[in-house]
């Protein structure tokens, strides 16, 4: 669990007693490729810190999968709207490859916030980062061409995700067809 501790210590120094509180509520879980952790209509019960692997959040629009978020090693992921509201999700959370996570249940997370204000600050910081990510994505969709969105994705997610995400899923994230993505990639000789 040192990856998680290192991640958290970037923002707030976690002492031993705080770390012990957090460790007590973490579940280590492993999932196979293409396994759904949350389905549309289901209430999201966990937030996940990814130890290794790759996941995506997506929704269905007229039967077509639209990817809205990718996360890999060293990042948090959930279907956040459902997690926060504790109402049924409109999204799916799926592994793209075999994945190991540290899972924290929503109920235990709220209890932890009440026990220790430092964890509530961490939660607020993560929520703020999530909001900024969504805001930037919305702005990019409104102001950038498909090529510009692709370049933004490369600059934001780096090679550690781009080489692992199937082209069809990446294309849906960018709001384009897979064939268009193939042409754009060809212009930059990135495969």
Predicted regions mapped to residue ranges:
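Alpha-helical bundle regulatory/interaction domains
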Residues: 19, 93, 108, 118-135, ...
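Glycine- and acidic-residue-biased ligand/ion/polar-headgroup-sensing regions
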Residues: 34, 45-56, 73-74
């Amino acid at each position: 669990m040192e990856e998680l501790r290192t991640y958290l210590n970037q923002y707030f120094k976690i002492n031993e007693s705080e770390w012990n509180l957090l460790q007590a509520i973490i579940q280590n879980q492993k999932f196979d490729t293409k396994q759904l952790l949350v389905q549309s209509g289901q209430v999201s019960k966990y937030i996940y810190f990814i130890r290794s692997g790759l996941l995506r959040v997506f929704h269905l629009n007229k039967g077509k999968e639209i990817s809205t978020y990718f996360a890999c090693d060293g990042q948090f992921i959930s279907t956040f709207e459902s997690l926060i509201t504790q109402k049924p999700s409109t999204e799916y959370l799926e592994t793209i490859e075999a994945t190991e996570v540290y899972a924290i249940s929503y109920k235990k997370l709220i209890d932890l916030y009440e026990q220790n204000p430092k964890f509530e600050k961490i939660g607020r910081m993560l929520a703020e980062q999530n909001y900024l990510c969504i805001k930037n994505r919305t702005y990019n969709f409104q102001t950038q061409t498909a090529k510009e969105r692709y370049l933004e994705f490369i600059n934001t997610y780096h090679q550690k995700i781009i080489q692992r995400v199937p082209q069809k899923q990446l294309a849906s994230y960018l709001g384009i067809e897979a064939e268009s993505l193939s042409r754009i990639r060809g212009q930059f000789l990135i495969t």
